[in-house]
Design a protein with these regions (language model features):
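Non-heme Fe(II) oxygenase catalytic core, chiefly the N-lobe of the double-stranded beta-helix
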Residues: 1-126, 131-186
């Protein structure tokens, strides 16, 4: 990812080390979350608004996916939490209150300082991270300012997330590849 900013103090990105966050869970909690599946909805984060073709396409065909809560890295075999406060909204099979309580616990746990790396953008900076073992967080106030923030992102196609139980992620609604192609072609 490369970024251009006009607001000097909005140049930080936070990357969560999802493998470390998983490893630091207690053994009983790891055993519990290993088999759980999360429901993810692709939508603009709070405070942001989709515009134009993106908004039209995502309203026509919402992107809803079931991912394992714990993902196994295809190359290293390490487990990591596959959680994102921006997308993950429920845990399949749990009552709403149970789901919300567990998500809050996992979100709070995963953003502890020992699991985060902060990267400060400088002119010409380019950052790479492995989304199979990390999670990206934009600055909290990025959408509450009048300053421009332009990001250039390359996402490499890869494999579907596989959980500790061996099951892959499943698209429940929408097609993210078709959406990306439609946006690219227009």
């Amino acid at each position: 990812m490369e970024a251009d900013f006009t607001k000097p103090d909005a140049r930080t990105v936070c990357v969560l080390l999802a493998t470390g966050a998983y490893d630091a869970l207690s053994e009983p909690l790891r055993a519990f979350v290993d088999g759980l599946r999360g429901l993810h909805r692709f939508a603009p984060p709070p405070g942001a608004r989709a515009t134009g073709l993106f908004e039209e396409k995502t309203q026509q065909q919402p992107l809803l996916t079931e991912h394992p809560l714990v993902r196994v890295h295809p190359e290293t075999g390490r487990k990591s939490l596959l959680i994102s406060p921006s997308f993950l909204f429920a845990i399949d099979g749990l009552a709403p209150r149970e789901s919300q309580a567990l998500l809050e616990l996992l979100f709070e746990h995963s953003i502890r300082p020992e699991f985060t790396v902060r990267f400060k953008w400088e002119p010409g900076s380019v950052a790479f991270w492995d989304n199979r073992a990390t999670a990206h967080l934009a600055p909290q106030d990025v959408f509450a300012t009048a300053f421009d923030r332009q990001l250039y992102r390359v996402t490499l196609g890869g494999d579907a997330a596989v959980g500790a139980d061996g099951r892959e992620s499943v698209a429940l609604s929408g097609n993210p590849v078709a959406l990306a192609q439609a946006l690219r072609d227009n």
